[in-house]
UniProtKB/Swiss-Prot annotation:
Gene3D superfamilies membership: 1.10.287.1480
InterPro entries the record matches: Ribosomal_uS14, Ribosomal_uS14_bac/plastid, Ribosomal_uS14_CS
Protein's name in the database: Small ribosomal subunit protein uS14
GO MF, one example: rRNA binding
GO CC terms: cytoplasm; small ribosomal subunit
Keywords: Ribonucleoprotein, Ribosomal protein, RNA-binding, rRNA-binding
NCBIfam families to which the protein is assigned, alphabetical: PRK08881.1
Lineage: Bacteria, Pseudomonadati, Pseudomonadota, Alphaproteobacteria, Sphingomonadales
HAMAP family found in the cross-reference section: Ribosomal_uS14_1 (MF_00537)
GO biological process, one term: translation
Keyword field contains Ribonucleoprotein: yes
Length: 101
C-alpha cells in the first residue's frame, strides 16, 4: 500500500486540474495558435505560468484504485499489475481469462 499522504496529494492535484481545466485549455489553445501574433501568444504563455503548478494535468499520477501503487498501472482496469493478476486469478474481473495455447 502506498503512503496515504502520496495518495491524498495526488487527489488534491486531480481536483486542481479539474478546477482549472477550462482556463488551462483556452490558454493553451491561444498559445499554440500559429495564426495569432507573437505578443498574444506570449501573453497566453505568461498567464499559463501564473496558474498553480499543480493545475497542469501532467503532474497527476495514475495510481491503482485498490492499493494506490503508482507503478505498473493498467489504464483499462485502473489497477496495478499485482492487483490485476490477483483479481484475474480469482475470477473477479469479467472477461479476463488466463491465456493458453
Amino acid at each position: 500500500m502506498a503512503k496515504l499522504s502520496s495518495i491524498n496529494k495526488n487527489e488534491r492535484r486531480k481536483k486542481l486540474v479539474e478546477k482549472y481545466a477550462a482556463k488551462y485549455a483556452a490558454l493553451k489553445a491561444t498559445a499554440d495558435d500559429q495564426s495569432l501574433d507573437e505578443t498574444e501568444r506570449l501573453i497566453a504563455r505568461l498567464k499559463m505560468a501564473e496558474l498553480p503548478r499543480n493545475a497542469n494535468p501532467t503532474r497527476v499520477r495514475n495510481r491503482c484504485n485498490t492499493t494506490g501503487r503508482p507503478r505498473g498501472y493498467y489504464r483499462k482496469f485502473g489497477l496495478c499489475r499485482i492487483e490485476l493478476r490477483d483479481l484475474a486469478n480469482k475470477g473477479l474481473i469479467p472477461g479476463v481469462t488466463k491465456s493458453s495455447w
